[in-house]
Every structure is written in structure tokens, then in C-alpha cells.
């Protein structure tokens, strides 16, 4: 992976990095096989919000076989370290919220994955995912026609945080990014986002992106206990 970039115009981080060309090619080959065998594949279109025709499930086992899952879990730990650095740690004691997050990561897995072949004028309205962490990776991007109004939003993904009127003076609740092939973004599953449509010269352009959710069954009861007890911190030492 290349250098990590962190975008945080609101309170939760959005992690951005890129995968190697070799890895991207493996994922393109995998998704090509699925796309070419549509009659035997399971569409995820009814389960996600996108106004996109071709959206297909990926068995997480297939991603494990090509070591994609290992890379994503490592990225999840990088995300944890970023969050940890944003917390105030006093006397080497970790807030309970991070203890819960760390426990989740120790047992986390890709709970669902899918890809879509987005075509001209298709889009995905504002939505959020299920799970703990989610991500999107870009495998193929066509050449877009210029925007009619020069706003450079065609084909962009926009992340949307929470903002009050006062916060708006010193922060920005939205972040618009025009992704490139190989770009991968990781974010809390609750972070809302939307995808703009685009146009291509022949009207046959395809942008392929792969999305995934990370979750663990062992995280849920701990999270409920934490919220129910209303405990805001607990003295648990950091592990070496």
C-alpha cells in the first residue's frame, strides 16, 4: 500500500490509500468472472440503495483466497491507530469506546461484499452501510464528458458528516472526492455518502467499484452493554 491520507472535516476519520496495480488486476479478473456469469450470480441490487442495474454479490471467501481480506483487516488496524491518536490518553489508560473497538477488530471479518458496474446517468443516493467499518475500492474508471456547469461533481463520491450551524463556521460537513483507479476509502459504516452520476462520450462507459462491510458477532453484546451502562471511560491498560 502507498502512503495513508486522513480526511477529517468532521469528527470521524475517513482513511484513503491505494492498492497496487497487481492487486487491482486480481480483483478485476475476479469481478470479470462474476460479471460474465450473471445468470448464475446473485444480484445485490434489491439490498443496496444505488440506482444501478448491475450490482453483484461477492462471496467473502473469494476475497480471502486472493489475500484481499488480510489487507483490509490490516487497514482496519491502521484506522484504529488513527482513532487512538485522536483520543486523549491519560496515564496510559484507554477510553472504553476504544476498548470495544479494539475487541471488535480482534474478531472482525468481511461480512458482506459486492461490486457494481455503474454506467452513464446511474447514481447512488445518500445512504449508509451496516457493520462497524466499511469501504469502497475503485477498479475501473472511464473517461467522463466535461461537466455541463464546470462543478467537477460528475462521478464523484461525497461523504457527509453531522454538522450544526455553529460547527459550520469552523468545519465542513461534506467532502467530495473524484476517485482514481486503485483508490480505497475506509470509514465508519454509519458515515453517510452518495455517488454522483456521470456521462461518457459513447454512453457506454463503465465504472467498477467494490464495496465491503466489516463486522463481528462478538462486538454486538459489548456495544449494547457499553451504551446501556452509560459508562464513558474505563481504566484498561494499553497492550504492548
Predicted regions mapped to residue ranges:
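Non-heme Fe(II)/2-oxoglutarate
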Residues: 1-103, 121-124, 239-240
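Double-stranded beta-helix
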Residues: 211-240
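Catalytic core of non-heme Fe(II) oxygenases with the double-stranded beta-helix
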Residues: 108-186, 196, 202-206, 210-216, ...
